[in-house]
């Protein structure tokens, strides 16, 4: 909220208010408007106010028609003065000048109190200025003025006036003020309503994200104009992150002719009036751009990888089966061969040249010779282990040997 304090000199405040009529409409070629001087729609008894009717008319033809509470009055001048206002002057005022349409109504209220909160108007459109004045009876000075909205203070002023240069929806509420004269006074509440000019924009894309490279993408900054103003033109700006894509264009669309991976990011838009009195930003919209993809359909890729997986599983099972069969066959062939060779190996003995017996065990793979415990060992080729030396001959044989 932008607040500006003023002193007793009201020229700046008056200049601020005259460009916007009381009814909240900009001067146009079809509708008349009413302005007030001084610019307050609430005044004390015995105070003066002048209403001015402005609108299109032919040169030299400024004939004006005034309406009070719906009844035409016999006044044909562009100005309507109320000297020393009374309660009977309270009511609804309209005017029509030249070829214009009747103006929007202005509600004038006459009060009798010690302290009065004056407003430039009670109903206005966001972006328009609002002037407030804490006014003492018979223009008595008021010090240490505090302004309140909905019961909460929002401005302390050393003088009695304050202005909100650009109103928004949060400025709607019940306003009052308090100040010190001979005593501490508090004004009655005044209802101020700020109407929305256009809705908060929403950024939408023509295609769903993510989308492939090369896609044509149109971004649309959508908003609804709630109040029609003659000559009103909205301006649209587009951004990605902090980068400006397009600034203050009258078109609500932005085109990405051929999307690339670099175009991915968070996009948002901004809508503003021509004088930037109302400016609103949309939420962010994330755009994701996919890299190059095969032209084959998705179901083809699923079927392909499923087939590869099945073939791999079958090959693994077959390999394990074949390997197991080979091992079983080899085992069945080796067992009989080893058994037969073992029997033959145990059925013969061999006598060495030195008279020592040795037994040879032969198998299909190797033989191991065995030597008698007390005699020398001899290796015979690949024979099996040597057997112990046979027992000596009987006693009779030994006797014959000793005799000889």
UniProtKB/Swiss-Prot annotation:
Protein family membership: Belongs to the immunoglobulin superfamily. FCGR1 family.
Transmembrane segments: 298-320
Known role: High affinity receptor for the Fc region of immunoglobulins gamma. Functions in both innate and adaptive immune responses.
Glycosylation sites: 28, 48, 69, 168, 249
Ig-like C2-type domain segment(s): 32-111, 117-194, 201-286
Name recorded for this polypeptide: High affinity immunoglobulin gamma Fc receptor I
Natural source organism: Mus musculus
Observed phenotype of the null mutant: According to PubMed:11911823, mice display altered endocytosis of monomeric IgG and impaired antibody-dependent killing of cells by macrophage. Antigen presentation is also affected and those mice develop only reduced inflammatory responses. An increased in IgG responses is also detected associated with an increased number of antibody-forming cells. PubMed:11911824, also reported that a variety of IgG2a-immune complex-dependent immune functions like protection against bacterial infection were impaired.
Annotated region described as Interaction with EPB41L2, given as residue ranges: 321-342
Cytoplasmic side: 321-404
Classification via Gene3D superfamilies: Immunoglobulins
Disordered: region residues: 346-404
GO molecular function: high-affinity IgG receptor activity; IgG binding; IgG receptor activity
Residues with Phosphoserine modification: 347
Any GO CC annotation of this UniProt entry: external side of plasma membrane
Signal peptide (residue range): 1-24
PTM notes: N-glycosylated. Phosphorylated on serine residues.
Keyword Isomerase: no
